[in-house]
Amino acid sequence: MADVVVGIQWGDEGKGKIVDRIAKDYDFVVRYQGGHNAGHTIVHKGVKHSLHLMPSGVLYPKCKNIISSAVVVSIKDLCEEISAFEDLENRLFISDRAHVILPYHAKKDAFKEKSQNIGTTKKGIGPCYEDKMARSGIRMGDLLDDTILEEKLNAHFKAIEPFKEAYDLGEDYEKDLREYFKQYTPKIRPFIKDTTSMLIEANQKGAKILLEGAQGTLLDIDLGTYPFVTSSNTTSASACVSTGLNPKAINEVIGITKAYSTRVGNGPFPSEDATPMGDHLRTKGAEFGTTTKRPRRCGWLDLVALKYACALNGCTQLALMKLDVLDGIDAIKVCVAYERKGERLEAFPSDLKDCVPVYQTFKGWEKSVGVRKLDDLEPNAREYIRFIEKEVGVKIRLISTSPEREDTIFL
């Protein structure tokens, strides 16, 4: 059976810590979408690890880690991550169906961002997915055969010829790209496998599989705050599509949310706090992007968005992250509805324009940092947790009270 870990906000919820905390109980940990525009931050034995493509199970020697077919892969960045770990043989596998991000994709991304101003990381994620949908992309499996790779490269050079100047590719682009593959392909080849068959067989044999998403539900290309979204499907449903596991294989869906809200880049954010309180949350929560180092926009927990995300994903349990960031705040707000042009909205709309948050205020608490038992939390903190559970309709089974792996309350 497989369990899914999915972010139910705008990403950066703390999925890495949760996966790292529970990965030891699984045979496989699988990253099922996105690219190196997302980052997993894990603190292990006092050392901070920032992972962008590698599944969070790499810190456990007995865990097999898979990058599945819906992930788009920068082979340069993946090679750099691989070099930071030892003994990855037979522990890391990359789907032969996953698509390769080319340097061209990053150039195109930067060019388009000038006019669209979506707030992308300009890592080439979107353009790579564009080529995938246009059926013109290069897949990891193509790297296993030099003849096929050469054919794919020639087709790529022909297709981009009209855009070389616009995307500032340079006169030596063809030569440079061939050198690029020559440098990184030998390092990547040993890890490329038919991971779809591997996972189907593992599931049939009763292996325990953990499916790890990137970004968050509200950034989903179809169901998120379009056009300010990522280029992939971020909900739990995409875990099946990417891995080849059928929906019957899914057991638990663990939704990850912070005790407050954050967002990186542009786009609507009804519960954003533009006062010094937002700055306080950012500073105390160390809310800066793992990948870009950009400061995250911060605000109060949005239960309208949270209920929507839980319904989309079929969450069976929740993990509440960074409760300790709210320590010492006298009055804590929670968005319980929106108001738009005199109308109260309790369902998440497709367009958040003109939506104003309706808040309910709770008394704060002094300290929760480092607490590992529910009974040791102050009454006001427990009341806050119970309110979230009641409103969302999903039990909170895990509460994080610091970045350290051990500072976790299990319920």
UniProtKB/Swiss-Prot annotation:
Residues reported to bind IMP: D12, E13, G14, K15, N37, A38, G39, H40, T121, R135, Q215, T230, R294
One record GO biological process: 'de novo' AMP biosynthetic process
Enzyme superclass (EC): ligase
Binding site for Mg(2+): D12, G39
Gene Ontology CC annotation, any one: cytoplasm
Cofactor dependence: Mg(2+)
Main location: cytoplasm
Coiled coil region boundaries: none
Nucleotide-binding as UniProt keyword: yes
One Pfam family matching this protein: Adenylsucc_synt
Binding site for GTP: 11-17, 39-41, 296, 322-324, 400-402
Protein family (similarity comment): Belongs to the adenylosuccinate synthetase family.
The protein's name: Adenylosuccinate synthetase
